[in-house]
Swiss-Prot record:
Keywords: Amino-acid biosynthesis, Aromatic amino acid biosynthesis, NADP, Oxidoreductase. Shikimate binds at S19, R20, S21, T66, N91, D107, Y224. It comes from Dinoroseobacter shibae (strain DSM 16493 / NCIMB 14021 / DFL 12). Involved in the biosynthesis of the chorismate, which leads to the biosynthesis of aromatic amino acids. Catalyzes the reversible NADPH linked reduction of 3-dehydroshikimate (DHSA) to yield shikimate (SA). It catalyses: shikimate + NADP(+) = 3-dehydroshikimate + NADPH + H(+). One of its GO terms (biological process) is aromatic amino acid family biosynthetic process. This is Shikimate dehydrogenase (NADP(+)).
Amino acid sequence: MTEIKVPIAGVIGNPITHSRSPHLHRHWLHVYGIEGYYVPLHVQGQDLAEVFHALPKLGFKGVNVTLPFKERAIELADRVSDRAALIGAANTITFQPDGTIHADNTDGYGFIENLRNGAPGWSPRAAAIVVLGAGGAARGVLSALLEAGAPEVRLANRTRAKAEALRSDFGPRVTVVDWHGVSGTMEDAETLVNTTSLGMTGQPDLELNLDALPRSAVVTDIVYRPLMTPLLEQAVARGNPVVDGLGMLLFQAAPGFERWFGVRPEITPELRAAALAE
């Protein structure tokens, strides 16, 4: 009798109850009629290595990795993609048939695809891009923008030293500007990106003067709770096109689903609704 192996994937984090990934992948499994499972896994830090090596034996094809384990996932992998190595973090792990663990980072891909989908005609090559923040999310965004051909990225962070460290990692197309003077560097920018937590539910607002920003410039926020952050509301009020952060979450999930379940999923309004469902 032939044994049929049902594919399993999941998401690892601590805490994990906030993750929207199960909603996305279970929606796709239903839509494409795939018999498979996607489960949230609450893991303690000291158990991460053991869990990574146990999951393939339990039938797992791979996992997404969320906070606080994205950096450690790199260390536990046998092979690391170039972009994950540059970013220094992985969010997509694939357990290969030969027993090796492959680590990738699809956050930057999700960011770029979200902008291309949400702002038709947007191009990273058009003009300077202003990025706010220098944390882990900013690394993924910078990597993707430079790979996509951005001519200049102006980076501002409340702690300037962190921005300078990113500039050292990413090279001459990244310039560091003062956090308090960033508004004055926007007059020729065509994209403004917020990668900080400012404006997120429960966090202080991002207080930023957009008067110098061209009204043609696309404004995007990687935060998706709330969908319309104060920054996006301010941009809409002055006529700028805006792209919310939810699409980044949706698009970054697609490559992993394809690797684990064999189907390239579509990003649809129904998927957005599933992601927002409580």
